[in-house]
Swiss-Prot record:
It catalyses: 3-phosphonopyruvate + H2O = pyruvate + phosphate + H(+). Homodimer. Homotetramer. This is Phosphonopyruvate hydrolase. It holds the Pfam family PEP_mutase. Gene3D superfamilies: Phosphoenolpyruvate-binding domains. Keywords: Cobalt, Hydrolase, Magnesium, Metal-binding. Partially inhibited by EDTA. Activity is restored by Co(2+), and to a lesser extent by Ni(2+) and Mg(2+). Unaffected by Cs(2+) and Ca(2+). Activity is reduced by Mn(2+) and Cu(2+). Divalent metal cations. Co(2+), Mg(2+) or Mn(2+) can be used. It comes from the Bacteria. It comes from Variovorax sp. (strain Pal2). Its cofactor is Co(2+); Mg(2+); Mn(2+).
Length: 290
């Protein structure tokens, strides 16, 4: 079974599929080892790793090459966050085959204007395109894919933009009609009430995708019980964990005036070498170096 088929089968199964954010291949490998079903190729995390805002500042080629590197490192499906599709429907028609060829099994595209502003800012620009325009972008994406099992996910930002439940449902239905395989509904409310209301009222046939960053109260068991949700994405926990751990270790080294105390608490160099695939390289050396 290919990665694309695995993701499609998971969506069709009715069981909850979990995806963890990653901003480089090493983090993706750790996510796979932890048992997540897939990788979320997060634009927010990649932007943060370059220390720039999540506002389409990084080029498509920068994001695409990282997705290619991640996909080549893990054996689980990669869901690529392509923001607004890097332009209009013409751009989307070009972009989708690039991500498919890079090894992604799905793309998530949101209905904001280009360039976007991050949904996580309370005072950000949350400007949405017309429904008809985004339907065209979805149609372009589905037409451009070579493999029918490649998944196109439409991300509805109406709740983020403060447009209410009715508009969010209207957009979700329109995007399903345009050919989206799933609908990602996003909210930054600190309780799950807004999302739960949307899920309850969702009349569509395609599964929903949730990103519970703002409402961590919902467990996977809670989400699975909703029955309409096919994927849960942990959208930025890798970069947040990395920043917290690095900051703590650096501060401790400065405080201690050296690494003697902190070293025992860190993964060993041997562990890092193992994560680099050293054993595989040594096997190649033994077989082919003459």
């Amino acid at each position: 079974m290919t990665k694309n088929q695995a993701l499609r089968a998971a969506l069709d199964s009715g069981r909850l599929f979990t995806a963890m954010a990653a901003h480089n291949p090493l983090v993706a490998k750790l996510a796979e080892q932890a048992g997540f079903g897939g990788i979320w190729g997060s634009g927010f995390e990649l932007s943060a790793s370059y220390a720039v805002p999540d506002a389409n500042i990084l080029s498509m080629s920068t994001h695409l090459e990282m997705m290619r590197a991640i996909a080549s490192t893990v054996s689980i499906p990669l869901i690529a966050d392509i923001d607004t599709g890097f332009g209009n429907a013409v751009n989307v028609h070009y972009v989708v085959p690039q991500y498919e060829a890079a090894g992604a099994s799905a793309i998530v595209m949101e209905d904001k204007t280009f360039p976007k502003d991050t949904s996580l800012r309370t005072d950000g620009r949350q400007e949405l395109v017309r429904i008809e325009e985004f339907q065209g972008k979805i149609a372009a994406a589905t037409a451009a894919r070579a493999d029918r099992d490649f998944v196109v996910i439409a991300r509805v930002e109406a709740l983020i933009a403060g447009l209410g439940q009715q508009e969010a449902v209207r957009r979700g239905q329109a995007y399903e009609e345009a050919g989206a395989d799933a609908i990602l509904i996003h909210s930054r409310q600190k309780t799950p009430d807004e999302i739960l209301a949307f899920v309850k009222s969702w009349p569509g046939k395609v599964p929903l995708v949730l990103v519970p960053t703002a409402y961590p109260q919902l467990t996977e068991a809670d989400i699975a019980a909703l029955s309409k949700v096919g994927i849960v994405i942990y959208g930025n926990h890798a970069i947040r964990a990395a920043v917290g751990a690095v900051r703590e270790v650096f501060a401790r080294i400065r405080r201690d005036g050296g690494i003697r105390e902190v070293d025992a608490a860190l993964p060993s160099v041997k562990e890092i070498i193992e994560l680099q695939g050293d054993e595989r390289m040594r096997a190649v050396e033994a077989r082919y170096l003459k």
